[in-house]
Design a protein with these regions (language model features):
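Hydrophobic alpha-helical transmembrane segments of multi-pass integral membrane proteins
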Residues: 1-392
Length: 392
């Protein structure tokens, strides 16, 4: 046997689910995302009458502090190891983080509101600690802000629960709205870092570029939006901020040459998802002017941008960190197309009053299908060892 073959690494046998953060959290996020549609239907049908969180409040809470925070956890626990060269939780500590997240999903469907509040506020703090130690040990100051954002998310989810429990006098929805702005900021930061890079690496001659002024305006406008929501500014001010943000993010996307990525699914899904951020901001401006309801803008961000960006990143990082080629076949294309169609149906189909209920139902089914496909396709990828035999 030639030496080159004799010394090739062989994948280790056994369960690899707890080897690195992306593995359990991407799997949990996809399964939860697919089946949460059933839980939403059960709530809507009155089959969970004693659930602490009900209706649209549960729906929004679980989109942010169930699905989205799980993907953020998987991404950060993996990325921080790469950024710092230091260990992040694996094995039993990683399992404990996953159990804490699962407990939060269960408790909001029970009557135990105080316990649900404590657990859901604790998870972002635990995640901040998990990434904070390696970041600080490596003095990776560029990414310290993630620690702060996670602590802000913890404070916001706690505020929502305290409001619901009657401990503070603010609308429970305020914490969710501000948390959505924080998630938008995270997507804007990471999108600006990775989408141009992935575009130029994956599409020869794409020529994706960045402009310092556009970058500052794009990120600054999202911070302004957070402050506008926090202080409940006048509608004219909100209109100006959201229009400026839409223009800034639209210019940013144009610099990335999206039209050149059509033949590369692992790249175009990121561009398509980012386009929904621009749509979200434009629809928020229309809502501030009283021309549309606010839910259209919310779902452009949650279904289109968050759904598309997380699905694209979960696919890309799962393949890259398990030693697989960064390619996509019909399975991945179907997942990406389903979540984008779900967004279009939910946002634009719902604008016709007669089609609103049908658009909600159809988009929910399309969403569940997209993430169900991911769970089925990537179960073996996420639970088995790397193909190249490397750790992780």
């Amino acid at each position: 046997m030639p030496n080159a073959l004799r010394h090739q690494p062989v994948p280790a046998a056994g369960l690899a689910l707890w080897n690195l953060g992306f593995r359990p959290f991407y799997l949990l996020a996809s399964i939860f995302s697919a089946f949460s549609v059933l839980a939403w239907a059960a709530q809507y049908s009155g089959w969970l009458p004693y659930a602490y969180l009900q209706g649209s409040l549960w729906h929004g809470h679980e989109m942010l502090f169930g699905y989205t925070i799980a993907v953020i956890a998987g991404f950060l626990l993996t990325a921080v190891r790469n950024w710092t060269g230091r260990a992040t939780p694996e094995g039993a500590p990683l399992m404990a983080l996953a159990v804490l997240w699962v407990a939060g999903r269960v408790l909001v469907l029970t009557p135990f509101g105080a316990a649900a509040a404590a657990v859901n506020a604790a998870f972002p703090v635990a995640l901040a600690v998990a990434i904070g130690f390696p970041l600080m040990q490596a003095r990776n100051t560029r990414n310290y802000f993630f620690i702060g954002l996670l602590l802000v998310l913890s404070a916001l989810v706690l505020a929502s629960h305290l409001a619901l429990l009657g401990a503070i006098e603010v609308p429970p929805q305020l914490g969710l709205r501000l948390a959505l702005d924080v998630v938008l900021f995270i997507m804007a930061v990471m999108g600006g870092r990775v989408i141009p890079m992935f575009t130029n690496n994956g599409v020869p001659g794409a020529g994706a570029t960045r402009h310092l002024l556009v970058e500052r305006l794009a990120l600054g406008s999202v911070l302004a939006l957070f402050l506008a929501d926090l202080f409940d500014v006048q509608l004219a001010v909100m209109t100006a901020i959201t229009l400026a943000a839409a223009i800034a993010h639209g210019a940013r996307l144009a610099l990335w040459r999206s039209w050149r990525t059509v033949g590369t699914p692992l790249v175009w899904i990121l561009h398509a998802a980012y386009a929904w951020i621009v749509i979200h901001l434009a629809l928020r401006a229309l809502a501030a002017m009283g021309w549309l309801g606010g839910s259209y803008a919310i779902h452009a961000l949650t279904v289109g941008a968050i759904g598309g960006l997380t699905l694209g990143m979960m696919t890309r990082t799962a393949r890259g960190h398990t030693g697989r080629p960064l390619t996509a076949d019909g399975f991945e294309f179907a997942m990406f197309a389903l979540v984008q169609i779900a967004a279009a149906v939910r946002v634009f189909g719902g604008m016709a009053p007669s089609a609103f209920l049908a658009s909600v139902q159809l988009s929910g089914l399309l969403w569940a299908a997209a993430f169900g496909l991911y769970a089925v396709r990537y179960w073996p990828v996420l639970t088995r060892s790397r193909l190249d035999g490397k750790p992780g």
